[in-house]
Amino acid sequence: MNGVYAPTFCVGDKVLIVWNSGEYGKSRQYIVGGNKHMNYTLVDLLTGEFLTAPQDTLSDLREIIQNDIDNGIIKFIQIY
């Protein structure tokens, strides 16, 4: 563990993610999106692309992000 933990998300939160490396570049900004059918994901503010497949709950989304942190894919994450 690197001391970084996925935050508890709310729909409409803006999220800054700093990646260790890869196709996403050094850092990207996202917004937590969802609808009445509970399809939650992080939406890239620059491209509009979904970071994850739609999830049933915000807890499921948090778990996916935490797995990326634990696996060293995400270096830093912050809600702003």
Place the predicted regions along the sequence by residue.
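Mixed-charge, Lys/Arg-rich low-complexity intrinsically disordered regions
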Residues: M1-V11
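Generic beta-strand structural signal
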Residues: C10, G34-K36, Q78
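Short beta-strand or tight-loop elements
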Residues: V11-D13, R28
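Basic/aromatic-rich interaction segments and small domains that mediate binding to polyanionic partners
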Residues: W19-T57
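Intrinsically disordered, low-complexity, charged/polar segments
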Residues: L45-Y80
